[in-house]
């Protein structure tokens, strides 16, 4: 079976945890970390690539992408259109 290249977009959240930077690929829910923001981004790109390759090898790529909110279009898979990313604070009696 011939292989084809998959081009997919995702939004990256980046934050610091102690001395590490964490990168999170939304909406795929894949995360990685590094000592610098650039290192975390590169590690995340590698992790996303491995995640998608594994899903392809298992025959579950379509389901994984649909579950993450992607839609199959004429030009390939299109991710959700973000309308905002917000930070909220909530006080809870515990």
Predicted regions and their residues:
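Short, charged, surface-exposed hinge/linker loops at domain edges
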Residues: 1-9, 38, 42-94
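Generic secondary-structure boundary/loop-capping signal
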Residues: 27-28, 62
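A short, exposed loop/beta-hairpin motif centered on an aromatic-Gly-Thr core
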Residues: 28-39
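Generic alpha-helical hydrophobic packing signal
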Residues: 22-24, 31, 51
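Short aromatic-glycine-(Arg/Gly/Cys) micro-motifs in beta-strand/loop hairpins
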Residues: 8-27
